[in-house]
Amino acid sequence: MRKLTILFDADDVAENLCDCWIEMLNERYGTSVTLEDVQNWDMTKAFPTLTKEQVFDVLHTDEIWKRITPLPGAVEVLQKLHNEGHELYMVTASDYRTCKPKVDRLLELFPFLDWKHIIITNNKQMVRGDILIDDGPHNLVGGDYFKILFDRPHNHSFDAASTGILRLYTWEEIYFAIQTYIYTVLHTTEDFYGD
């Protein structure tokens, strides 16, 4: 069986950045915003009393990256895929000021990865792989890979089904979808061509 190149996003797919971001803003400014209040990509809309600078400044602190933790099932599923021999690449869009603390923390949380398996880009469609798992519809549309949208409150308004994108809710579902993809797409093609 051919091994896959699996691309996956970091923030709000592998780890809980949005939760930590909201928590830090609530602590700093006495607000009471919840994850469900963030209904789109513009975090400032969930914090209308704060300036854009106040909302985004916390991302440039080391503290936020120390707080992030893996989303449920992420480490286990990614470790399993790694053990099965698939190539894993964490593909993330990051401000240059956050790269080092962010990547250092991600490598702590996902010790089976190293720097060679972290790709930092704002244009994920330029990265080649078999599968991309992301919470940003804009990262999936137009890419040349099997597309999995990781469900988060900020992407609920996106109609994934109408664009041929698979919306999934847990890492366990993602693992099952990848196994199904291997069997139905790759296995059938290998049988046909005799690979």
Question: Model-derived features: where do they sit?
Answer:
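Structural recognition of alpha->loop->beta junctions
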Residues: R105-T121, T163-Q179
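Conserved Lys-Pro-Asp/Glu-containing loop-to-beta segment of HAD-superfamily phosphomonoesterases
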Residues: I119-D144
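Active-site neighborhood of HAD-like aspartate-dependent phosphohydrolases
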Residues: M1-Q54
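Short, basic/glycine-rich phosphate-binding loops at helix/coil junctions
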Residues: A46-T61, G85-L88
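A short acidic, often aromatic-flanked loop/helix-cap motif at beta-alpha or helix-coil junctions
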Residues: W41, N123-G129, N155-S157, W171-A177
